[in-house]
Amino acid sequence: MAGEKVEKPDTKEKKPEAKKVDAGGKVKKGNLKAKKPKKGKPHCSRNPVLVRGIGRYSRSAMYSRKAMYKRKYSAAKSKVEKKKKEKVLATVTKPVGGDKNGGTRVVKLRKMPRYYPTEDVPRKLLSHGKKPFSQHVRKLRASITPGTILIILTGRHRGKRVVFLKQLASGLLLVTGPLVLNRVPLRRTHQKFVIATSTKIDISNVKIPKHLTDAYFKKKKLRKPRHQEGEIFDTEKEKYEITEQRKIDQKAVDSQILPKIKAIPQLQGYLRSVFALTNGIYPHKLVF
């Protein structure tokens, strides 16, 4: 009809509303959109930066500017019950005889020392984890085994080749020349100052005397009696003399090792020779 407006049907389909379920099982209509928490307006830092890493206000000033003192913090309570320690009594009341003595007397359980040192000497405290030298673990390089030929790098016998016998209690190595070949007697040396070579001899059957210990090789200091006549003018020094026991022990060890050295060709000459570096020879490129 003329003059009448025709209503157009809605082509857009309406989305079905989401249903909400109560705890009782009833369905409620409503939107599924969760309520967002309200956020404050973003703002710049309250501590403007003067230079990179340095702010205008100090830490204490920012504490008051942010009103940090208004915040309340509560520490988490531990569920473990603390055991109450029993207090150790410092004094004990003891009965005392006599009419005029008061009947009782308070006595200290921990008495003070009767005598005190005249000088204040600090006590040497052993720190945690540290042990004295006698209790240190003695380690030996994997390349050094009994019978290994070693090159001594320091001392009067430097450059000479010796035979390693065993490791002593102090960690030092017991070596011998033998004395007949290179004039190196039974002596101690540190494993830091030797080069272990790949040349080895079998000394499993060699019997080393048990008394060859650190005390055996320790130098003995000569004690002179004090106030001896003419001691001011005595200029002669007593020379070290080899004891007969040392000579016997040297022969006992060398007599067992020498036959094993002679059994290997060219080993006698190898032990007699002295190790040295010449021009163009670099120690880090050598294979020992």
From Swiss-Prot:
Gene Ontology terms: biological process: cytoplasmic translation; regulation of DNA-templated transcription; translation
GN (gene name): RPL6
Residue list for modification N6-acetyllysine: 239
Coiled coil: none
Subunit relationships: Component of the large ribosomal subunit. May bind IPO9 with low affinity.
Crosslinked residue numbers (Glycyl lysine isopeptide (Lys-Gly) (interchain with G-Cter in SUMO2)): 5
Pfam families (alphabetical): Ribosomal_L6e, Ribosomal_L6e_N
Subcellular location: Cytoplasm, Cytosol; Cytoplasm; Rough endoplasmic reticulum
Presence of the UniProt keyword Acetylation in the record: yes
The entry's keywords: Acetylation, Cytoplasm, Endoplasmic reticulum, Isopeptide bond, Phosphoprotein, Ribonucleoprotein, Ribosomal protein, Ubl conjugation
Residues recorded with modification Phosphoserine: 127
Chief location category: cytoplasm
Protein name: Large ribosomal subunit protein eL6
Residues passing through the membrane, by range: none
Annotated family: Belongs to the eukaryotic ribosomal protein eL6 family.
MF terms in GO: cadherin binding; DNA binding; RNA binding; structural constituent of ribosome
Location of N6-succinyllysine modifications: 94, 207
Biased composition (Basic and acidic residues): 1-25
GO CC, any one term: cytosol
Bias type Basic residues, positions: 26-44
Organism: Homo sapiens
Functional summary from the UniProt entry: Component of the large ribosomal subunit. The ribosome is a large ribonucleoprotein complex responsible for the synthesis of proteins in the cell. (Microbial infection) Specifically binds to domain C of the Tax-responsive enhancer element in the long terminal repeat of HTLV-I.
Residue ranges, annotated region (Disordered): 1-48
